[in-house]
Amino acid sequence: MKRLVFTLLLLASLPALAQNAVLHVYNCNDYIAPETVERFEKQCACKVKQSYFSDNEELLAKLAAGAKGYDVLVPTSNYVQGMAKAGWLQPVDKSKVPNLKNIMPAYLDTPFDPGNKFSVPYAYTITMIGYNDQKIKELGLTIDSWSAIFDPRILEKLKNRVTVLDSQSELMAAALKYLGYSVNDRDPKHWQEAKQVILKAKPYWAAFKASGYIEQLAAGNIWLVHGYSNDIYQADLGAQEAKQKFRVRHAMPKEGAVLALDAMVIHKSAPRADLAHQFINFMLDGQNSADLTNMIGSGNPNTAAMQHIKPEIKAMSAIFPDEQTAKKLEMLKDLNSKERRLMNRIWTEIKAK
C-alpha cells in the first residue's frame, strides 16, 4: 500500500517537474539561432523561454526595478562589473563550463570581469557604418570616416536618409572618435564637444533607431546607418533576397570604432542555475557558437567555431577585422554613478532639441 501511494505521488509530481524544467533567457532579439535552441531543448529535456531587451540600458533598468525569474542574461561585457557590484549576478562555476577552453585568450580576463568570475564571452559586434552602395556612388561620396554621420557638408547630400543608433553610449562614442578622442574619454568638456557635434548633425538624420534600420536599409528607404556589423550584414542579405539593384556595404571608420563583446551571465536568483550552466557550456561548443555567426554575421571569439563558419563570412574584415584594424577598436568601459548622471543629462538634451 505504501509503495502504491509513493508511486501515485511520484506520478502526480511529474507535471510539476516538467513545468520547472524551463530555462529563462533574457537576450537581444534574434541573438540565438532557432536550431540551436531546439538542440539544447532536446539535450536537456527542457524548454527555453526567451525575453528580449533593445539595449543594455533597458536591461539595467529592468534589473534595477527588481526583475526576477531570469536564469541567463546576455549583456555587453562592460556592464558586467556594475551588475556584479549591484548584486544581480552569481559567479559562474567553471567546473561546469569545460568548453570555456574554446574562447580565444584575447577575449578572456577583461578589465570588466577579471578571471571571468561572472561572465563568459558569447559574441561580439563592431559599431560602424552601413550604406547603400548604389546611392553612395551616385552621390560621389567615399564612406571611410565618421564624417559621414556627423559632417553637415556630407549630410546635406543624405538628408533624411541617415539613421543613428538610439543609444547614448554608442552615439557619444562615435562622436568622440570623430573628434579624435577615445570612446572612454571622461573629460566633461570633450563630452560637451561631442554633444555639439551630434546636435549639429541631428537635423539631417531621419531617426534614432535601436531596431528597424535593417529593414529600411535593405528596402532602400535609408541610405546610410550608424549600426552594428551584424545588423548591416543582415541588411545586405535582405537586399539580396529582395533582388535589389544595390548591395549594403560595411565601412569601418578610419578613426576607429567600438567593439562590443557580449557575454553570458547568471542572475543572482536564477531559478535554474543548473540549466544555466548547461546552456552556457552548450553555447561554447564550436558548432553551436558558429550557428549564431552563420545566421546573423556576428563576430565570434570561439576558436572551435571557426571551422564551422561559412567561408564568405570568415573572409569579411568588418566581422573578423585584421590586426591593423583591430588596434583601432575599443571596448566601452562602464560609467560610475556621477558620470552616468551627466551622460543621462547630455542625452536628454540631445533628444529634446
Q: Model-derived features: where do they sit?
A:
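A bilobed periplasmic-binding-protein/Venus flytrap-type ligand-binding module shared by bacterial periplasmic
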Residues: G130-K135, K177-G180, A260-R272, D291
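Conserved C-terminal helix/tail region of periplasmic/extracytoplasmic solute-binding proteins
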Residues: E215, E323-K353
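A ligand-binding cleft/hinge motif common to bilobed small-molecule-binding domains
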Residues: Y79-G82, L224-K245
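Mature extracytoplasmic/periplasmic domains
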Residues: H267-K328
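Extracytoplasmic ligand-binding site segments that recognize negatively charged/polar headgroups
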Residues: T76, V80, A84-Y204, K209-A218
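Early extracytoplasmic/lumenal segment of secretory-pathway proteins
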Residues: Q19-M83
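Periplasmic-binding protein-like
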Residues: N102, W191-K200, A206, Q244-V265
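N-terminal signal peptide c-region/cleavage motif recognized by signal peptidases
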Residues: S13-P15
